[in-house]
């Protein structure tokens, strides 16, 4: 991991001023520092998983919990009825900029379809 990738570890340990909106033993969710929508939340596992390709039999429940928490946050933010987007990027060509598995929850306005 390089310094850019370590930022998520610092957020989990609350070593930054990042606004954490949810944290449990499995995941941490926080507001994106450069939001692409009125609501832009990042959900990460509390243990290091590099990419979607690294989800396996042992850690697949972590991924399911990430998705569950993203939906729970969407409901709490009152965007679940109007709609929201969950985005995950994998590796360089997939647009992943930080080498740490993370999920973007975007909403609060009409979002453009990717396809």
Curated annotation (Swiss-Prot):
User: Which SUPFAM superfamilies did the record assign?
Assistant: HIT-like (SSF54197)
A GO molecular function assigned to this protein is: catalytic activity
Top-level lineage group:
Bacteria
CDD domains, alphabetically? PKCI_related
Q: Which residues form the HIT domain?
A: 7-115
Q: What is the name of this protein?
A: Uncharacterized HIT-like protein BUsg_345
Organism of origin is: Buchnera aphidicola subsp. Schizaphis graminum (strain Sg)
């Amino acid at each position: 991991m390089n310094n850019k990738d370590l930022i998520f570890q610092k957020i989990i340990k609350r070593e930054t001023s990042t606004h954490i909106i949810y944290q449990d033993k499995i995941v941490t969710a926080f507001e994106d520092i450069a939001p692409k929508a009125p609501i832009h939340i990042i959900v990460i596992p509390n243990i290091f998983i590099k990419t979607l390709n690294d989800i396996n039999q042992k850690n697949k429940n972590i991924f399911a919990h990430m998705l569950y928490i993203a939906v729970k946050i969407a409901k709490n933010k009152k965007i679940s009825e109007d709609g929201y987007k969950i985005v995950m990027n994998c590796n360089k060509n997939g647009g992943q900029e930080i080498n740490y598995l993370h999920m973007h929850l975007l909403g609060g306005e009409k979002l453009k379809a990717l396809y």
